[in-house]
Amino acid sequence: MNPNIETAYALAKQQYAAQGVDVDAAIAALDNIPVSMHCWQGDDVTGFEASAGALTGGIQATGNYPGKARNAQELRQDLELAMTLIPGAKRLNLHAIYLESEQPVARDQIQPEHFANWVKWAKKMNIGLDFNPSCFSHPLSADGLTLSHPDAKIRQFWIDHCKASRRISAYFGKELGTASVMNIWIPDGMKDLPADRLAPRQRLLAALDEVISEKFDEAHHIDAVESKLFGIGAESYTVGSNEFYMGYAASRNVALCLDAGHFHPTEVISDKISAASLYVKHLLLHVSRPVRWDSDHVVLLDDETQAIATEIIRNDLLDRVHIGLDFFDASINRIAAWVIGTRNMKKALLRALLEPTQALRDAEAKWDFSSRLALMEETKSMPWQAVWDYVCARNGVAVGADWLATVKNYETEVLATRK
């Protein structure tokens, strides 16, 4: 290790110790907090279905940066490089459209065998897998309704797809020894004002109950449901609203997914974590960066990312909150996007772990809000960067922006050959 990194770390450790912060404990904790990286950044949410069509569901990947993965082998190769540039525990989040099969497979017929290569790869990488049914970009989602569709046959197709997805998720958990969190997000909604807001929600409620009727060991599989405010083409009404899924998660004992881009522009999910934790056992987070809408920009080390991490750590929720990322930017190098976003999430977690939380709470308990604010602000200028550099170095990961050269070299030698 570079002696300058060790020296800076030793000095930082002394400063944190003076505030009552155990840096070694913080690093040990960080090493074991997995962040679930999303596979769909690597190919702009295209997937590997034989009949893959245009991206639908009110979501968009904008840009045309060269070198996107064209098959599972290339996607895994790209992910491997990205993961070597990120310290600590990681997971991979897969969508159903990332199956591998020599023959076309209907979505309601997908099987664990179609994801066997992903499991084999995950074992090699020593990571867990998470999963999602893909209720978009399909002829039977063209009406903008899936699990809430008034046509019973179409609705049943999507119910069966979600059921099949749960079996795959449970297979992941059993094979890898770590529970797969399977998140159900549907694009169901309407462009203009509906005459009946209740009936689609009644259908969705019944459909979800059928989806989760088969029981699995929570050690292998955890169900999650995700709300959204609106999507393109569903501006006026979303069937799976925040209130719908909050009630569903609490009443059915499933996890609630909070996506940073799925609320009003001035709402933040960091404020929702503590409230939701009182009513649901598990929370799934989709950390993203909405720019004026659910644009899924690459995650920054900004105030909200930091606030999300801080809420998890302050409230001791690591065993109940599952951290996932959800962004897809096709205008920049896709591997760089993964690395930037995931490292930023890790940095936010480290900063939260290095916070003198007890001192803040003591000041608050005494109604000493001046000290509370002063300590919060002084914490921002503590030498957490020296600790981060040390974390990267001890994990054999590039320090600072040194990783960028590796990505640029890979772009020249590998990505540029993909036409």
Swiss-Prot record:
InterPro entries: L-rhamnose_isomerase, Rhamnose_isomerase, Xyl_isomerase-like_sf. GO terms for molecular function: L-rhamnose isomerase activity; manganese ion binding. It catalyses: L-rhamnopyranose = L-rhamnulose. One of its GO terms (biological process) is L-lyxose metabolic process. Its EC number is 5.3.1.14. Pfam families: RhaA. Its cofactor is Mn(2+). Keywords: Cytoplasm, Isomerase, Manganese, Metal-binding, Rhamnose metabolism. It is found in: Cytoplasm. Pathway: Carbohydrate degradation; L-rhamnose degradation; glycerone phosphate from L-rhamnose: step 1/3. Mn(2+) binds at H262, D294, D296. Belongs to the rhamnose isomerase family. Catalyzes the interconversion of L-rhamnose and L-rhamnulose. This is L-rhamnose isomerase. It comes from Tolumonas auensis (strain DSM 9187 / NBRC 110442 / TA 4).
